[in-house]
């Protein structure tokens, strides 16, 4: 069972602005699973996230860590948003 109290996969070398961008993206992913999220909001936050997390390897590592602790996949959320293109997505179980 996934705990509702989990930590976010953050890099200690990030500055406050970078942490804010990453957290905004992870929060949008949470909203996609827990309720629904506007596709544009999720994709915009992903673009900002990618300015901080430039490498695919680090992005995959963050996805794995976040999925392990929260049960939510950043990859699946972005994939669904890109396929939907507009409106809202909901990945709730």
Swiss-Prot record:
Chain ranges passing through the membrane: none
Listed Gene3D superfamilies: BH2638-like
Entry-linked SUPFAM superfamilies: BH2638-like (SSF158504)
One protein family per Pfam: UPF0223
Family per record: Belongs to the UPF0223 family.
HAMAP family named among the record's database cross-references: UPF0223
Protein name listed in UniProt: UPF0223 protein gbs1030
């Amino acid at each position: 069972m996934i705990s509702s109290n989990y930590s976010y996969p953050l890099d200690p070398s990030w500055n406050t602005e970078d942490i804010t961008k990453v957290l905004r993206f992870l929060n949008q992913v949470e909203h996609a699973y827990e309720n629904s999220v506007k596709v544009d909001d999720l994709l915009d936050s992903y673009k900002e996230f990618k300015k901080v997390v430039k490498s695919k390897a680090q992005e995959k590592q963050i996805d794995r860590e976040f999925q392990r602790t929260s049960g939510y996949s950043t990859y699946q959320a972005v994939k669904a948003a890109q396929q939907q293109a507009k409106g809202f997505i909901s990945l709730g179980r």
